[in-house]
């Protein structure tokens, strides 16, 4: 009878290892980094509108510019990793990088969507501002990826961190999309214009700033030098070491190629101009875009839960390979469909 009420042993008790654990409020606050990352992601999806409306850049040229900046993004990633290894201040490492990344992102987006937009500047200004945004985005994204292992290395607590991140990852874009398209867009005349872009970037800066502050509060208890110390003597990271690993590590090369191609595809597919052509021209109903985005959240959450269980049962490798094949098959079907139909009818 007592066994029924016996407390479940912790991972530390089972493994004999003293794990680091976070409180629930710390996990939730750290998940608030999505308030910056995902609102910015939604805003930058309208970069094609900003380029066309504010800088007079042709739609086709915008696609080339945004895709080409992915190459610049690939250059900034190792540089930021090099920077991350060397930042160590009395205010911590992670908090400094989070605030620094936010400031750079906010400045670039503010200039791009508001201050310098529709002021007579052209393609060069837009490209430089977009590159500045990429720098801030890289700093922020790379730092955010280190938050979960900093919060907890307890295997029993990892699912809790993942659940809260998933909740924010789905809810933030949904709410932000409603705010932009249902609330803000009608107030600005019902069309994507300069007033709408300016108001949108102001909202992102405010919400992103709040998210950054909350994240810094949540991680403050773990943002200490001892959290980053490795066992034994710590050797400084050098560019030579990074190049050596890149040249001789075949799995890493495949991983980089896979992620780079995925990122390019995601960047192109997420541009607002794609949605405009699909819903505005082919389907003829732009409001349907927002409705479908909200409706799609439920199956997305279901698939996220199913995917986590599938990977846990069959392993991450099989999960990625199997569902990548499924996604490729679906993509081929969509391509054949859009080639076969006549969008004028």
Language model features by range: what are they?
Residues 1-3:
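Short, Lys/Arg-enriched N-terminal segments with co-localized hydrophobic residues
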Residues 5-345:
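Membrane-embedded alpha-helical bundles of multi-pass transporters/translocases
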